[in-house]
């Protein structure tokens, strides 16, 4: 089985690697591919889908966010990993040596604005003058800005309260914020615990695109580049398995992350779209550019930023053929 490394171990560069059994394909044979994973996700999914028989050595490093994955890539500690559209904007602004190589179709119904069950807030326009929690420099800040803009408001019209997810939950439960822009399993867990209401989801405000990125230097190595392409295809096939075995995956993932199975299964069934891996398109580049432009307006990154050079389309034909 693949070794799973901590972020600290990876950035220190001091970890051993385990070669996996060779598969039929020889893509990237003789090299080690270092892949980022989120808790309980990529390694377990690939294993369940029978996709871990890589012809190259494979190691996983566990990370809590895409921004940290970019940091690890820029430090030369990770070769490939996934993230939202937000980290590539900061990568472009900082000159980080990463490339966006594939587009992930993923759920946005799990990104919402919550309000307490008895709150008088009934529509996004009612957020004016209210204390609204969000996670700074993440999708929550982006879709909150877009939700406000759609009703003629901006961050200047609310009291924005940047909080970590854990601090946001505490503030929400204690009534210290009037609304909370949040994502992931914090949503159904908070709803189950307090009866909180979903004021609005990010569907229509987020593109539903996420990014698979690769270390620029890894792409310059023919064997590593081939291994990355093979890995992307395995991820794509694993997601197809997930859609066909949603209940099995709910059990596996629930056990791995310590979230009740019914909550995991409910979120999977409520997804805005099934997971898939697609080629980079002009529309996908434009979507990340829109994020960059919004974050420039919010003062989070200096402008101007052109995100187009961040994208590498070399795997487009490979991913399109496997559709």
Predicted regions and their residues:
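Sec/Tat-exported extracytoplasmic proteins
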Residues: 77, 82, 92, 131, ...
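N-terminal secretory signal peptides and thylakoid transit peptides that target proteins
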Residues: 1-18
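Pocket-lining segment of extracytoplasmic ligand-binding domains
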Residues: 86, 167-255
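Solvent-exposed, polar/charged alpha-helical surfaces in well-ordered, non-transmembrane soluble domains
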Residues: 71, 75, 89, 125, ...
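Conserved C-terminal helix/tail region of periplasmic/extracytoplasmic solute-binding proteins
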Residues: 293-323
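Short, glycine-/small- and polar/acidic-enriched structural segments
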Residues: 28-154, 160-162, 178-184, 199, ...
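Secondary-structure end/capping motifs
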Residues: 221-302
